[in-house]
Amino acid sequence: MIYPITVFGDPLLRQTAKPIDKDYPELAKLVDDMFETMYFSDGVGLAAPQIGLSIRIFVIDATTYADEEPELADFKKAFINPEIIERIGDEWTMNEGCLSLPEIREDVVRPETVRIKYMDENFVEHIETYGGFAARVIQHEYDHLDGIMFIDLLNPLRRRLLKGKLTAITKGKVPTKYRQKLPGKK
């Protein structure tokens, strides 16, 4: 099932998501649906709040970037109840976008490496360290679980310059190939 993408302005995107347990109803289907929604929307990652669920899970498939970073060749994962243990290394800037902020791309500064603890879709715990593009996408999706969007990491002047675009998003005036769930709409 392809979910509509919850876009900027919906209060759910600003909530801290709740952990889930291994008995979460139809977890395998949810993970599959999240990947399907992400692929349909041309995303690299997708967090549950972006499909209207305030739970601590995100999915990433960075395999299409394996030409630039060979270690991404098999990087397709679900992260359940993740916890970033450590952010390390030099900060670096990269242009980011977000399905919940269509047509907005901005340079965002993030640490180059993260150490993360999470459960996979079988509720097996992992503690792993990622760098480069994988670390960036993990941090971006993880932020969604804490109600943070990449525009929050921009300087105040840059954010002010985006006000018109953000207003257009909340009103559904930014066309996308995917269905959008607008603020205040069911």
Question: What positions do the PLM features span?
Answer:
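Active-site rim/adjacent substrate-binding subdomains
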Residues: 1-139, 144-186
